[in-house]
Amino acid sequence: MDQRSVRDILAGKTYFIRTFGCQMNQHDSERVSGLLDSYGCLMALDPEHADIVVFMTCCVREAADTRLYGQCNSCKSLPPSPSGKRVVAVGGCIAQRDGEGLLTNVDNVNVIFGTHSIAHVAELIAEAFLDGKRHIRTNEHEDTDAMSMPWHRETQYHAWVPIMTGCNNFCTYCIVPYVRGREKSRPFEEIVDEVTGLVRQGVREVTLLGQNVNSYGRDLFGKPRFADLLRAVGDTGVERIFFTSSHPKDLLPETIDAMAETPAVMPQLHLAVQSGSTRILKEMNRRYTREDYLGLVDRIRNRMPDIALSTDIIVGCPGETGEDFEQTLSLAETVRYAQAYTFIYSKRAGTPAAEIDDPTPHEVILERFNRLVKVIETTAHEYNQGELHTVVPALIEGTSKKNDAVLLGKSPKNQTVHAPIPEGYSIDQLVGKIVDVDVDVAKTWYLSGSVVGEPR
């Protein structure tokens, strides 16, 4: 179908996108939104008022499948759409993994598009409106580069900037390489030019995205390094740079130096450990040891003593013994994470770990998980306590969900910051501004205090 025909069908139709999962999925949703906008569609605030409902999915954990099926089924009870006809589309990792198999679980989905087929979603939706049939596209070898598509940003001050897609690591528990494909880096200058343009538009903060940003550039001519990219993005004038995700085996000394020497790179690093047991790390195919990881943490803190480290940890991987878990617990106590995402192992069909039977009772795994959570809560609280009676610059994102008279912001260490809206200002005047907050309360997951000085 040609672009004019797609526009004729879609122009004026409303759409709603619900996103599950990681930051890459959030950016994928922004790309779908930007594509629909380019064909004259209008964003709706809820599915009830949408002609097009899109679910961007994650398949890292089993619960994501169940949640998707529930969301799709809930669309059956929605009132008629504004145009009188509604198309339900499912994209992302579950769509890529299951393809036509989704149709056996949900009977009201009209469009299925995989992680490599985002550039074709408008055409697929238009065809579904036109002929009422189901349309599926999950080609793993699409040659259209969707990383350069237009997108609809959720905010004017922050932007997700993909620098690469895919993963070559094939950790034994992880489905991501099978649904996102092999690593593909974006051209160096294209990324720098994009950030330069974003700065001109008023963007103050960017998050560089990739399944493993530390391996950026290995597939490009000249093999530019992630460290070089950090420095170049820092030279664009953007005020804040975050990035995710980092694989410990690929975090080189030159990258640590670039982080320490580039003022715009924020003092925060997400460094997924997954387990503190060398034996389990080997079973996971992580390709580093407990000692390697702890040595890396020491090198990072030697260059950036006050950096906020966050991580991912899985409890209950097949074969994990009590001793293995104690190793994980002691590593968490040693590193003193500022934040951690902790998970109970979720079997993913098609991964090597899914073939291993584990006799460990669920109640034992749950008890271990709860012990780990308590350690993380303790270290996170202790880290935040270090911010008491300091002044923290917070980029304001909106208001607290519990109190619209209280600002919600983010510190350079990715901490949530609350402060009452200062007298003489409205929230509209402050969103996207940086305010200094004198911290007088430090809880486990947030800081709070009072605004001092003028917003900037």
Region roles according to the model:
Residues 85-92, 97, 200-325:
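Conserved SAM/AdoMet-binding glycine-rich loop
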Residues 19, 245, 273-275, 396-398, ...:
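Flexible glycine-/small-residue-rich
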